Amino acid sequence: MTYALLKKIDAPADLRKLDRRELRTLADELRAYVLESVSQTGGHLSSNLGTVELTIALHYVFHTPDDRVVWDVGHQSYPHKILTGRRERMNTLRQFGGISGFPRRSESQYDTFGTAHSSTSISAALGMALGARTLGEQRVSIAVIGDGAMTAGMAFEALNNAGVYKDLPLVVVLNDNDMSISPPVGALNKHLARLLSGQFYAATKKGIEKVLSVAPPVLEFAKRFEEHAKGMMVPATLFEEFGFNYIGPIDGHDLDSLVPTLQNIRKRALEGAGPQFLHVVTKKGQGYKLAEADPILYHGPGKFNPAEGIRPAAKPARKTYTQVFGEWLCDMAAADKRLIGITPAMREGSGMVEFEKRFPERYYDVGIAEQHAVTFAGGMACEGLKPIVAIYSTFLQRGYDQLIHDVALQNLPVVFALDRAGLVGADGATHAGAYDIAYLRCIPNMMVMTPSDENECRQLLTTAFHQNCPTAVRYPRGAGQGVATEAVLKDVPVGKGVMRRTGGARSGQRVAFLGFGSMVHPALGAAQALDASVADMRFVKPLDVELVKRLAEEHNYLVTVEEGSVMGGAGSAVLEALAEAGIDIPVLVLGLPDRFIDHGDPALLLSQCGLDAAGIERSVRERFGIGQAPVAVASRVA
């Protein structure tokens, strides 16, 4: 495709110069460009193919960037990026030094609010609308939110707050495409089904059908009206109760419907008609049959040939940590009927598909509702069950108060299986699990574990399951070390690390690495060159203080290494232990620096942070003057 029309669009102002009849052609070109781009770089696909017409209509009608558009989650923002001057940079999408896969304020004036976690858009758009009013500026703020994100309480908190302002130019666009990563769940999604399956409705319907059976054309009309009513009745009532003027549902792929509807909405909003709620229905994967047929497979693919589609991948030589967790979960559930599996809408990503199939009565997907997931697990634990909350490290941040107040304060035995701990690569800083060690180890009663390989992950999960306190096991995204897992469900001694290498003293300056989780193996690589000792600490809390003291006594220098924030992390725990013991020894703390790490290849990012074997070795030599002329060492003394 030549993209003749699309190449003329470098900003929404160019788009608004087009005749409305040209928008259909533009949509076809834009959809093809999204498919071509994502197939070459990897990224989110299904959601972006579904928002092409909506994106065009929004930028065609609203005066962006003066009018503010906030994209909830933001993984559906590729058409937006293409239309706002980043078309030629799509080949750098989610790559180191390239454009982000999510809206980013530093990237474009059209990215009015940075997003990546769900359900934040309405709050942000409301703040912008009231901010504009405070400044005496007239503009419209628009939140575009998916049906999956509408399961989160934060979205309803914002709706409840927004409805108070009866003349505020705020627009909420519900992109109803059934596209949370796992199917949306909960009462909101089932409310209409309950209403339409009730006894009164069934009896009324049966009676009407009996009366109208003598007039088939009228009966057919009634059936069509019923289908329309199913989409209209409950949403209108619900959102109007919040103080919004509800419009819809309308076809989110029909530009002839979208454009005039949005024009009317903008006009009414600026005339003081108050908050507007537009319900659009879109199809995930629209226009690419393979993605339409399997939108979950095409939710976030890697590179692929669009003509062939995603081919079955060869079985990897090494299991991922997510697979290790999924297998352990099924094995542990078979061994102990108290086990309950909980996920906040991340069944596939957290490795729970097989568990749901085998133990459906013990599987709970609570929707995109992390706060609820944590407290819900606490309630389960109160009844003597053993809940496992499978959650990404970055998403547990959303349930932090519940973690402290509802679980740890009551010392409830909930296991948090923290996937995506550390750097995650292409998704960047918004999805990095950089802070869990720091924010977990400060909580009383909490136990924190960091496995260094697949078998240790299985063992520490088993150990966590058998504790009578809240526990967290953090493990990284991607493949493990290739270590075979034992079939037996085996515990390890709580609070005890193990030595992986005992170094000599070739240099006369003995170094000991205290490795946590994924950093044990890079530390082993550095230790070979330095002839250093390496401890696999396994536990951040309770820390193996005796091992720390022994290593301090037997070595000249200690080096802690973790794939987490150095501020308040495992290295800080070691320094605290040394201070408590009154031990004075130079300590080098290595981990993720005090800044947000951008997107890119994980190995490259670790290298940039000095957390590969070469970087660790270099840091040790520079800090302690090993292998070079002696230098004064500004020791970090505990």
Curated annotation (Swiss-Prot):
<protein>
    <recommendedName>
        <fullName>1-deoxy-D-xylulose-5-phosphate synthase</fullName>
        <ecNumber>2.2.1.7</ecNumber>
    </recommendedName>
</protein>
<dbReference type="GO" id="GO:0019288">
    <property type="term" value="P:isopentenyl diphosphate biosynthetic process, methylerythritol 4-phosphate pathway"/>
</dbReference>
<dbReference type="GO" id="GO:0008661">
    <property type="term" value="F:1-deoxy-D-xylulose-5-phosphate synthase activity"/>
</dbReference>
<keyword id="KW-0784">Thiamine biosynthesis</keyword>
<feature type="binding site">
    <location>
        <position position="177"/>
    </location>
    <ligand>
        <name>Mg(2+)</name>
    </ligand>
</feature>
<dbReference type="GO" id="GO:0052865">
    <property type="term" value="P:1-deoxy-D-xylulose 5-phosphate biosynthetic process"/>
</dbReference>
<dbReference type="Pfam" id="PF13292">
    <property type="entry name" value="DXP_synthase_N"/>
</dbReference>
<dbReference type="InterPro" id="IPR029061">
    <property type="entry name" value="THDP-binding"/>
</dbReference>
<feature type="binding site">
    <location>
        <begin position="148"/>
        <end position="149"/>
    </location>
    <ligand>
        <name>thiamine diphosphate</name>
    </ligand>
</feature>
<dbReference type="GO" id="GO:0000287">
    <property type="term" value="F:magnesium ion binding"/>
</dbReference>
<comment type="similarity">
    <text>Belongs to the transketolase family. DXPS subfamily.</text>
</comment>
<dbReference type="InterPro" id="IPR020826">
    <property type="entry name" value="Transketolase_BS"/>
</dbReference>
<feature type="binding site">
    <location>
        <position position="370"/>
    </location>
    <ligand>
        <name>thiamine diphosphate</name>
    </ligand>
</feature>
<feature type="binding site">
    <location>
        <position position="177"/>
    </location>
    <ligand>
        <name>thiamine diphosphate</name>
    </ligand>
</feature>
<keyword id="KW-0786">Thiamine pyrophosphate</keyword>
<dbReference type="InterPro" id="IPR033248">
    <property type="entry name" value="Transketolase_C"/>
</dbReference>
<keyword id="KW-0479">Metal-binding</keyword>
<dbReference type="InterPro" id="IPR049557">
    <property type="entry name" value="Transketolase_CS"/>
</dbReference>
<feature type="binding site">
    <location>
        <position position="147"/>
    </location>
    <ligand>
        <name>Mg(2+)</name>
    </ligand>
</feature>
<dbReference type="GO" id="GO:0009228">
    <property type="term" value="P:thiamine biosynthetic process"/>
</dbReference>
<dbReference type="Pfam" id="PF02780">
    <property type="entry name" value="Transketolase_C"/>
</dbReference>
<keyword id="KW-0808">Transferase</keyword>
<comment type="function">
    <text>Catalyzes the acyloin condensation reaction between C atoms 2 and 3 of pyruvate and glyceraldehyde 3-phosphate to yield 1-deoxy-D-xylulose-5-phosphate (DXP).</text>
</comment>
<feature type="binding site">
    <location>
        <position position="288"/>
    </location>
    <ligand>
        <name>thiamine diphosphate</name>
    </ligand>
</feature>
<feature type="binding site">
    <location>
        <begin position="116"/>
        <end position="118"/>
    </location>
    <ligand>
        <name>thiamine diphosphate</name>
    </ligand>
</feature>
<dbReference type="GO" id="GO:0005829">
    <property type="term" value="C:cytosol"/>
</dbReference>
<dbReference type="InterPro" id="IPR005477">
    <property type="entry name" value="Dxylulose-5-P_synthase"/>
</dbReference>
<dbReference type="InterPro" id="IPR009014">
    <property type="entry name" value="Transketo_C/PFOR_II"/>
</dbReference>
<comment type="pathway">
    <text>Metabolic intermediate biosynthesis; 1-deoxy-D-xylulose 5-phosphate biosynthesis; 1-deoxy-D-xylulose 5-phosphate from D-glyceraldehyde 3-phosphate and pyruvate: step 1/1.</text>
</comment>
<comment type="subunit">
    <text>Homodimer.</text>
</comment>
<dbReference type="InterPro" id="IPR005475">
    <property type="entry name" value="Transketolase-like_Pyr-bd"/>
</dbReference>
<feature type="binding site">
    <location>
        <position position="75"/>
    </location>
    <ligand>
        <name>thiamine diphosphate</name>
    </ligand>
</feature>
<dbReference type="Pfam" id="PF02779">
    <property type="entry name" value="Transket_pyr"/>
</dbReference>
<dbReference type="GO" id="GO:0030976">
    <property type="term" value="F:thiamine pyrophosphate binding"/>
</dbReference>
<keyword id="KW-0460">Magnesium</keyword>
<dbReference type="GO" id="GO:0016114">
    <property type="term" value="P:terpenoid biosynthetic process"/>
</dbReference>
<keyword id="KW-0414">Isoprene biosynthesis</keyword>
